Amino acid sequence: PPLPGIDLPGIFQVRTVPDARAIRDWIERGSLFLSGMDKYSGFQTLRPKTRAVVIGGRFIGLETAENLVHRGFEVTLVEMLDQVLAPLDQDMARIVESYVERHGIRLALNDGVAGFQQAANGSLEVLTKSGKVHPADIVILALGVRPETALAKTAGLAIGERGGIRVDEQMRTSNPDIFAVGDAIEVRDFVTGEWSLIALAGPANRQGRIAADVIAGRQSRFRGTQGTSIIGLFGAAAAWVGA
């Protein structure tokens, strides 16, 4: 997102394996290391890293926060909604919130990020829309991703209301010679029959196999997904399924 100060060193996103390696290098090699953001050319003052702020309270955000706690960081998780794990009912989310707080994650809910700035000592400050300031030595953005459909649009493929590529049961797009699978597509919800975006590894794996079957001449088809999701945190698990 185009937030003020987002290109400061020490601010990372979590989307690719290189992103994860950059975070590890920043932590392990010390602060005299560029964050990898492409619009900033400075260095942060050399100092121990003990404070982390994670932006986003879904899968990646919570799992990242847990790993930072295990690395000895004081972790604050900032989420613009009034709960973590939005698919959960609020009373269930409260159980998760209480559990992770007992294990060292400080939650700042119902408060969006307004921007970032660098303090005089070289550390970072996360500014929120409520006016609060969260000091940090590393900031990790775990805000989720949108389907990358630029190529599909250029090819004239049908794009759904949720922003994904529309496919049929055999993973064919609106052009029958072009197949699409994975996080960039819209699929039918197994329960409601409505179009949905399901960014999960299990369905993506199955879709790839079905597309390969169809290309090879087999009559395989994707029957939809229930979006079953499970997250493990500090030895416990939370899960949900259905519409």
Task: Label each region the model flagged.
Residues D7-K39, G122-L127, K132-V214:
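FAD-site-proximal beta/loop scaffold in flavoenzymes
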Residues K49, I55, L77-M80, G224-G227:
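Short beta-strands and strand-loop turn motifs
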Residues E194-A199, D213-A243:
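Active-site-proximal substrate-binding core of FAD-dependent oxidoreductases
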